[in-house]
């Protein structure tokens, strides 16, 4: 059985490589090329976070019932180069929006689909597996369609803000 510490330990070498990089389009492309589906890191960490959701230690706090859950797995610390690690589970066939939020320092978001065709909206379109890397100061609704996904996100300094007003639609 895997544990949160297994996922944290697997993330340390990855975060060592990323500690001086900034979220955005260039990093998103690089993450998908170097660490996307099929890479050793992606497959290992995706397996661990899937185990965590199944076993109840990841994405286990309901935000909007059982279809939208999250949990912080690690606080920012020196060992993680001051990134936090959070898991989010979202499940909806029809497009579904979660809590509007802002990324003061950006976000590195590993998208793990649990159903074929499940996708998460990223800043550059829908992502069915791989990475999104919203820029610093970006803000959005997390949005899923096509089934269940896990979003495992790494936040510089653990910074995320839910204290922001969504734009008028």
UniProtKB/Swiss-Prot annotation:
The keyword Lyase applies. GO terms for molecular function: lyase activity. Optimum temperature is 30 degrees Celsius. Optimum pH is 7.0. Its EC number is 4.3.3.-. Keywords: Lyase. Belongs to the PnbB family. This is 4-hydroxylaminobenzoate lyase. It comes from Nocardioides sp. (strain LMS-CY).
């Amino acid at each position: 059985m895997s544990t949160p510490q297994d996922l944290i330990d697997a993330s340390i070498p990855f975060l060592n490589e990323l500690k001086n990089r900034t979220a955005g389009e260039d990093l998103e492309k690089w993450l998908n090329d170097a660490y996307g589906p099929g890479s050793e890191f992606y497959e290992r960490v995706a397996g661990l976070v899937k185990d965590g959701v199944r076993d109840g230690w990841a994405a286990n706090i309901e935000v909007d019932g059982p279809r939208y859950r999250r949990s912080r797995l690690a606080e920012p610390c020196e060992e993680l180069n001051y990134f936090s690690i959070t898991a989010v589970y979202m499940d909806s066939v029809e497009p579904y929006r979660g809590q509007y939020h802002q990324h003061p320092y950006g976000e590195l978001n590993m998208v793990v689909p649990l159903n074929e065709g499940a996708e998460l909206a990223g800043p550059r379109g829908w992502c069915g597996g791989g990475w999104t890397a919203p820029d610093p100061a970006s803000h959005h609704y997390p949005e899923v369609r096509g089934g269940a996904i896990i979003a495992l996100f790494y936040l510089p300094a653990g910074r995320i803000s839910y204290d922001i007003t969504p734009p008028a639609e």
